């Protein structure tokens, strides 16, 4: 980081990791603070319970200005089905800790997850509205569920009431498998 700052003058860093571990971010923050490196940085995380208010403040003190994380669906039932390892209450607590420390929070959200009902979606929208209202998140983006072959859904589609549509044999990327509902839902 020091070499890049010295060579380019750039002081803004986006650390690209879909789920940067809290322990690694703490080590980064401690090192940035000990070296007195005046940078701004942001990254991507899971809203893990180990992101305490104290850790969020330490990250802010080290120059962290924003975090993005996957809330996906604001439903404990669906989060469990997705095997996300977080709860809605935990996400609210962690996002509030980041926001209280002055770190902007962006939430990735989805709709159309297998077994997700219209009511689940309406409830999720209301919960997200409350997260905005209470200053827990500052931005969010909804996207339609996409099935990847190595996700829990892609590995066991029948457990989610879907059947994967076979990909053409010459397909390189397997990031968006088509599927049909076997349960009659859509």
Region spans (language model):
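Conserved SAM/AdoMet-binding glycine-rich loop
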Residues: 1-104, 113
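An active-site-proximal structural segment forming one wall of the substrate-binding cleft
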Residues: 4-5, 130-132
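Acidic/polar loop patches that form or flank catalytic/metal-binding clefts of enzymes
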Residues: 11, 40, 106, 135-142
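Flexible glycine/acidic-rich beta-alpha junction loops that bind and position SAM and/or redox cofactors
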Residues: 25, 77, 81-82, 111-119, ...
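Catalytic cores of alpha/beta
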Residues: 55-56, 115-130
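Hydrophobic, well-ordered secondary-structure elements that form the walls
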Residues: 69, 107, 128, 140
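C-terminal structural cap/anchor segments
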Residues: 98, 105, 110, 124-127
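Secondary-structure boundary elements
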Residues: 100, 133-134
């Amino acid at each position: 980081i020091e070499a890049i700052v010295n060579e380019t003058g750039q002081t803004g860093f986006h650390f690209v990791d879909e789920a940067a571990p809290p322990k690694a971010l703490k080590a980064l923050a401690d090192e940035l603070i000990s070296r007195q490196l005046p940078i701004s940085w942001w990254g991507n995380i899971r809203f893990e319970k180990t992101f305490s208010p104290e850790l969020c403040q330490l990250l802010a003190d080290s120059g962290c200005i924003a975090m993005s994380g996957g809330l996906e669906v604001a439903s404990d039932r669906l989060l469990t089905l997705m095997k996300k390892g977080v709860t809605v209450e935990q996400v609210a607590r962690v996002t509030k800790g980041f926001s209280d420390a002055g770190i902007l929070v962006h939430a990735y959200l989805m709709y159309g997850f297998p077994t997700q009902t219209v009511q689940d979606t309406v409830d999720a929208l209301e919960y997200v509205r409350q997260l905005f209202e209470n200053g827990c998140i500052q931005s969010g983006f909804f996207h339609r569920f996409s099935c990847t072959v190595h996700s829990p859904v892609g590995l066991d589609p029948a457990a989610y009431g879907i059947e994967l549509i076979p990909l053409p044999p010459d397909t390189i990327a397997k990031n968006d498998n088509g599927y049909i509902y076997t349960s009659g839902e859509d």
